[in-house]
Amino acid sequence: SDEYKNNIKKSKLISVPGCYATGSNLIIFPLTKMGLISNSHQFIIQAVSGFSGGGKNLIEYQNNNNSPFFYYGLNLNHKHLPEIKFHCGLENNPIFLPSVANFYQGMIVNLFLTIKDFEKETSFFEIESFFSDYYQNQQFIKVKSNDDIQLPDGFYKPNLIVNSNDVEINIFKNTNSGQLIISANFDNLGKGASAAAIQCMNLRFGFDEILGL
């Protein structure tokens, strides 16, 4: 957000959010900041990451075991939860289920909602328009609905965006049931780590924000 960018420009100590927190905050922060959903709402998040997200220990484990897929953090106390709760102004930790699959980098973070979770009566079109308007001036963030998402082979893949600072926020919906999934697709090593650090550095020292990205 513009508020965070301005804070970064004058800060002496800057930390880049964890990759799961990055995806979660990009979805939840606008909803709570603008009052679309109460900060007392019990958010539910599911995510999948490439195995590089676990650092050298998980990379070594995966190279030795070649596990196709696994969940972890099943004590519901993942280390990124305080970041999400603090920056999104939540009263409660989200229910968060992270997972790892057998690919090196890339990730998807999914937020599950219904149309009834919103504070005021709204439509799917208004939700899509809200996110598009909110991020319209953020060149690294693109918002799509499932009416115009082009899915390779018809599948939504977590390793579509790699070696990049880009994020796609995708909105999948069922107008009959009133259910929707708001999803962030990005590179856990890019926007979720090093590329975000470069963007912060550029902002802090007055460089072109996209320099090196």
Sequence positions of predicted segments:
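N-terminal Rossmann-like NAD(P) cofactor-binding subdomain of oxidoreductases
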Residues: 1-67, 72, 172-175, 211-213
